[in-house]
Amino acid sequence: MTQSSVNAPPSASDGISAAQMKDAMRKLQAELVAKYGDGQAVRVRRGLHQVMEFWRPEDGDVASFQSFVRTNFAGDQASLDVMFDRFQRLLEQLDGHMHEISREFRNQQDLDRGPVRPYDEVFGGYDPSAHVLDDFFQNKLAFTVLLNFPLTTLEERINLGLKWTRRQWAETRLAQRFAKRVPAEVNLAIAQAASESDIYIAGYNIWMHHLVDEQGQRLFPPKMRLLSHWNLRDEIKVAYADTQNGLAKQRMIQQVMERIVTQSIPQVVIENPHVDWNPATNEVKPATVHDTDTTALVNTRVINAPEPDTRYATLLKTYRAARLADPYSPTAPTLVDRRFNEDREIPEERVQAMLDQVLTSPLVPQVAKLIESRLGRPLEPFDIWYNGFRPGSKYTEAELDGLIAKKYPTAEAYRQDIPNLLIKLGFPTERAQYAAARITVDPARGSGHAMGAEMRSEKVHLRTRIEKSGMNYKGFNIAVHEMGHNVEQILSLNDVDYTLLQGVPNTAFTEALAFVFQGQDLMLLGLAAPDAKIQSMKTLNDFWGTYEIGGVALIDMAVWHWMYDHPQATPAELRDATLQIAKDTWNRYYTPVFGRKDVVLLAIYSHMIDSFLYLPDYPIGHLIAFQIEEQMRKAGGIGPEFERMATLGRVTPDLWMEHATGKPVGAEALLSATENALKQVGSQP
């Protein structure tokens, strides 16, 4: 499907005169109010207008419309209760089984199960639920919901939702399922673009032993294969503990990242252990050492021809696929609108203001000065990923890898230890076993992810990367994060009062709760005992991390706005625009601290390419996570508070946070704690 093939959706007036429909609605309203009483007048009027908003000529003529309304309006509370319960139960089954099929179809692509064949990619890109919304409008189940339950605006949910009952919130979420009427072919096109971008990102590995410097030295060990951007970034972090070669490694990784972002990286070095590459000069030669069992392709020319803007061509494909849904979403006519007003339920302007509040805080140069004093040198751009505030930085990667590989040689070994890990996090033994019994652990092809369930009878899946030598620190750190997702997924589905309220307000909350777990990774290994200084250091780490990812999010937001402003852009034009946006963002928020201009490093995030404007969830998640962690500290533990919060369900972000912590979402808690942490830690290295 091309963009030109998408036209504005037809309305009922295209085949039925507006006068006819207006007259029919007037008569129906009077008839139903007379039948069910004045107490139903508001519901009748609202329901009729909601149905009319989506009714199309193919749905039937005036007589069909009248017959449908008379047959399906629930005019008393008992009938409405039966309808609500039935839809809730059956939609859980539908969602659950569709999700189960999708998971199975994606397994070869998502899991470390050998080569991905062309047909595997087709299976992975197929969305069995793509036609469901279309079907529900065709069979008029969607219209039944719209006739009986309220569609609401974000403003109404924010301002009126404070006084709603849990049942009212569940009804609101039920109606929201049918707030758009997007054709199945559009949903399929979006799923296909998402699958293609996932494949591109999941295969973007760099063989680190084959990076050489000007002297031909290899700084990284054999067989090290790092996925961009996650593993490259994390290797920068662990290198702070390497007093001999850490700085050289970090500078080299920065060069690699910049080559990827600018697309000057030689195509031949991507996922290829058979060539050596000097990122500084961009020289490529046949490998002079071998650290893989794979065989080099015959007759492959070893040249440094750059990747042909594939990174930005892939991003453009996701934009053009997402844009196909725009005409069918009149209240949120761009992906940007849908992400903020529907998915996050926090206005974009408010998100931007919160991020700006952190990035321009006078605390930033104070923390930067402290980092410089600890490093004993001026900051360099890659120090945006400084992690020396974390207690674990005193351990080398090799020490952590050895400890973890021995403890978790397989995915099954990690699964068996989940109850113990949850008990260490403060969950009562019974609840730890309850959650662990509902988690399946799979070896991931990529960096790892958590796949929830959509019905209570299904288990959630934790996907983590397991090397042949066993789990390493990077894999463990990600696994703990994904385990946080999994526990939230279990509690917010199995223990919430209405399954229609399954989940949390938005994915920033999902990330926030996962960060709570991830921040305890070293404690789970028995390597850190929290005290006042450690807590202050963790606060500084959270603040610096939010400073970093906040800029990344602003780049992601600006790039999507640019694509909407330039719908006919080429990959090369998008590349140049992204680089300029990255430079402008760096120059505004980071040059005053780092003293260097026009740095493009923050555009390295793979999420920018395959995640459809997901990145703002991370800094919002950091702010939310900090508020949540502060509450857990006040309460004296993670487990019970985590469970209380996770079962609040999918209400608006501020309402959820008010119930969880007593205050709305904001940056103030992090900024206040950072100020106190600076006083606690001082300027001592």
Predicted regions, residues:
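Short, glycine/acidic-rich hinge or "gate" loops at secondary-structure transitions
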Residues: 270-276, 430-436, 495-509, 527-534, ...
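Alpha-helix capping and helix-loop boundary segments enriched in small/acidic/polar residues
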Residues: 409, 449-450, 466-478, 500-509, ...
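A glycine-rich phosphate-binding loop feature that marks nucleotide/adenosyl-phosphate handling sites
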Residues: 273-281, 435-444, 505, 535-537, ...
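Contiguous, non-catalytic segments that form substrate-binding/exosite surfaces or channel walls
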Residues: 285-459
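Post-HExxH zinc-binding segment in Zn-dependent metallohydrolases
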Residues: 323, 491-544, 621, 628, ...
